[in-house]
Amino acid sequence: NSRISVRAHGLFGSVAGDDANGNNPDRNLNFESKIYEGGVQLEINFFEYYIGSRLHPVTPYIFGGAAVFFFKPYGNVGGERVELQPLLTEGQSKSYNSYAFSMPFGIGVKYSISKLIGVGAEWGMRKTTTDYLDDVSQTYYLNDPASEGAKGLASDPTLTHVAGMQRGNSRNNDWYSFAGVSLTVKIRMLKKEGCLDHQREGY
């Protein structure tokens, strides 16, 4: 209806980070993860909005839902782009799952610019069930990373840490966010005689 709706969504994006540009240059890790997300969301408009409304042509809204996403982190190791998950950079007994769940939620605004066209913008956060979007979660595990080649460089680019030293923070899972704009076109399937909603007085 004009206040509450359910929508399906699909998104693609990437997140990246580099310690050289952050608060932990001594760690010197870097990554980029491609993210493919799909899910469902409940959307609640503040006002009774629909495309073509003259009474409420603009409305803010909030949304929340559930999603599943696929991610694959890469890093620059010795000048080469390397997939990090297979390297087990924290000495895991097996690779972490590349699929995880997230809880999307956020805010947006919609505007009806004509009887048939609407535009919108929104921003949302994703709370996830993984701590490996950046391939960093727990501790270093190599006492001599220089002897492990690319695997050692991916785990400890500075080659200065020893097993057990803190590498990440496993107490908190990772988050990411999306921002975007939308264009919506209203399609009339049947032509009806009489007064349509957007032609009513006050709309």
Residue ranges and their predicted role:
Residues 22-31, 78-84, 135-145, 200:
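Flexible, surface-exposed loop regions and adjacent strand-edge segments
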Residues 4-81:
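Gram-negative (and chloroplast) outer-membrane scaffold detector with strong preference
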Residues 2, 48, 56, 113-115, ...:
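Short coil turns and loop connectors of transmembrane beta-barrels in diderm outer membranes
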Residues 1, 40-46, 64-68, 105-111, ...:
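Residues on the lipid-exposed face of transmembrane beta-strands in outer-membrane beta-barrel proteins
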Residues 34-38, 58, 97-103, 175-179:
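Residues that define the transmembrane beta-barrel architecture of outer-membrane proteins
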Residues 114-203:
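Predominantly the C-terminal beta-signal and adjacent terminal strand-loop region
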Residues 89-129:
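A contiguous pocket-lining binding segment that forms or flanks enzyme active sites
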Residues 23-35, 88-95, 167-169:
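Extracellular loop and loop/strand-boundary signature of outer-membrane beta-barrel proteins
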